[in-house]
A protein has these predicted regions:
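Membrane-interface transmembrane helices that cradle and orient dolichyl/undecaprenyl
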Residues: 194, 232-247, 358
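Short acidic/glycine- and proline-prone juxtamembrane loop motifs at membrane-interface regions
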Residues: 217-224, 339, 392
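Transmembrane-helix motifs of polytopic, lipid-linked glycan transferases
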Residues: 170-194, 227, 231
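Start-transfer (signal-anchor) and selected internal transmembrane alpha helices
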Residues: 1-90, 191, 280-288, 424, ...
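Short helix- or helix-capping micro-motifs
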Residues: 199-210, 230-234, 248-256, 270
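Perimembrane helix-loop-helix junctions
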Residues: 237-238, 264-290, 294, 349-363, ...
Length: 533
């Protein structure tokens, strides 16, 4: 590209961004297009910064070449990020949601060797971690009539000695290290699947951002579950000997102890073992799995008097089958408080990858799809698909390794279409996560379905940003229409991405600011004049 063409391309990118922001300050334009009011707040300067970065890239017109730092450097980088953020956030805000319950279970296990929390609640042990009040979360009673916690005992068991040694901050440090290790495992899976160092690095960066970044310093089962799942899958796909196959079985068998919703994922890993392991490693895998399953059943029988893995809930909970799968899918993707894409837009590339031959022809695609569907299936029919009062995308954290590996298959191909946005999407999600965590006292990471989303309020201008994102906790037809608008925009981008692979003029649309600005304008118009009318 000649210097004059570079200059025109750079100026065009700046013009699109500056033009949109400039229109927002014209009263007549805002009256006609109310959504422009969102640019009269912090998002206006954000758009200008993005436009400036795109203009600089068009002016320089140099391909971005990033080498593979290797697993140890990636682990150290991830650990420093998670530890620094976790220490800052944990020091500035007490626990909430399910966190005090997991910590109280850990305290009871270490100090008293049991999970009878009646005395812990009587002493208000939760005051060590939160001002409360904290109401008990009890499931089905034990066979002797005593109450038993509704939460799975796996995470409290793992955290009990850590909590005894250093309290909540030590637990945060342990989860931060687990998150860093998870991202390295994802990097290895991506290298195996895509075979390109740049693709592996992108997969690591996607995994290290939200939502894993959120749960790397919250006391929930999501990061340990994702790590156990990803590590077990990586071992099974690596042609292991009997010893490593047994370790894969141990990791897969740990999933039900962390949360009962992970039982289908554990079963799927067993199917992957059957597909990939020869006789001796397969025997070692199932020897461990059988022993762990027997232990799980014995635990249920000893406590509840039944062998059912769902004994904690007294059988299959009504909430597990009363949800709407369609609303859950839309919510998991687009919900303004609990969705994935508003906080981690890089996973748009994973959705695009699923529609391409590159992923379906990649190594182990069937095994990865099997495990991914097993993770997703219990969530789709769960009434509380959003996970309660918690950071965004809670129940999708165990799916992040598979989403990251999927987008890496696309990153291994020539950079065209949506892949031109890969690093801006990574940067946008990570910057938003850091903004949300920087001021713990403002509670921007803690969401509930019955109130506005704090982070979008903080980023609003004259018009609320939250107006243009759906809230799908309740089955509101208006919110469903807003979600449909975003679903249509997503499908359009994926279609254009497929066309960009073969057609240079379409690919050129992804190189500047025109396509994203026009798409956001279209979404705003549809929300204002159709979805919310």
């Amino acid at each position: 590209m000649h210097s004059a063409e570079k200059r025109r391309a750079a100026l065009a990118a700046l013009a699109w961004a500056a033009g949109a922001v400039g229109l927002a300050w014209l009263p007549a334009a805002q009256r006609s297009l109310p959504f422009l009011g969102v640019l009269r707040g912090p998002l206006g300067p954000v758009l200008l910064v993005v436009g400036g970065c795109v203009a600089a890239s068009r002016w320089l017109d140099r391909p971005l070449r990033l080498g593979d730092p290797g697993p140890w450097r990636l682990f150290v980088s991830g650990a420093l990020l998670f530890l620094a953020l976790g220490s800052h956030y944990g020091s500035g805000l007490r626990v909430s949601g399910d966190e005090p319950h997991y910590l109280m279970m850990a305290r009871s296990l270490w100090q008293e060797g049991d999970l009878d929390l009646r005395d812990n609640f009587a002493r208000e042990d939760w005051l060590a971690d939160t001002p409360g009040p904290v109401a008990p979360h009890y499931g089905a009673p034990r066979k002797d009539g005593r109450p038993f916690p509704a939460h799975s005992p796996g995470l409290p068991f793992l955290l009990a000695p850590i909590y005894a040694a250093g309290g909540r901050l030590a637990c945060i440090a342990a989860l931060a290290m687990a998150a860093a290790f998870l991202c390295v495992v994802v990097h290895g899976l991506a290298l195996r699947t895509a075979g390109e160092p740049a693709a592996g690095l992108l997969a690591w960066a996607a995994a290290a951002g939200p939502p894993v970044l959120f749960y790397g310093f919250h006391i929930y089962t999501e990061v340990p579950s994702a790590l156990a799942l990803a590590a077990s899958l990586a071992l099974l796909l690596s042609a292991p000997g009997p010893g490593l196959a047994a370790l894969a079985g141990l990791l897969a068998s740990a999933l039900p102890w962390l949360h009962v919703k992970m039982i289908p994922a554990a079963v799927a890993l067993g199917l992957v073992a059957i597909l990939h392991l020869p006789r001796r490693p397969l025997a070692a895998f199932f020897a461990v799995v059988t022993a762990m399953a027997a232990g799980y059943g014995w635990f249920s029988h000893a406590v509840f008097g039944t062998w059912s893995p769902l004994a904690r809930y007294g059988g299959l909970p009504q909430d597990a089958t009363s949800g709407s799968p369609l609303r859950a899918v839309l919510g998991l993707l687009f919900d303004r408080s609990f969705g994935l894409l508003p906080y981690a837009p890089v996973f748009l590339l994973a959705l695009a990858a699923f529609s391409s031959r590159a992923w379906w022809k990649s190594r182990d695609a069937v095994s990865q799809a099997l495990v991914g569907l097993a993770v997703l299936a219990p969530v789709l029919t769960w009434r509380m698909w959003w996970g309660g009062q918690c950071p965004p995308a809670r129940f999708l954290v165990p799916l992040v390794p598979l989403l990251s590996v999927a987008l890496s298959t696309r990153a291994a191909l020539p950079v065209r279409g949506l892949m031109r946005w890969r690093w801006p999407l990574v940067g946008t999600g990570t910057a938003l996560a850091l903004f949300m965590a920087a001021r713990p006292g403002e509670l921007m990471l803690l969401n509930r379905g019955d109130r506005p989303t704090r982070v979008w309020e903080a980023l609003s201008g004259d018009t609320a940003v939250g107006r243009y994102l759906p809230s799908l906790v309740q089955p509101d037809p208006v919110e469903i229409r807003v979600a449909v608008v975003w679903a249509m925009a997503t499908v359009l981008l994926i279609v254009l991405d497929r066309l960009a692979v073969r057609r240079d003029p379409v690919d050129a649309w992804f190189r500047g600011m025109g396509l994203p600005v026009l798409l956001l304008v279209a979404v705003g118009v549809l929300v204002d004049f159709w979805a919310r009318g």
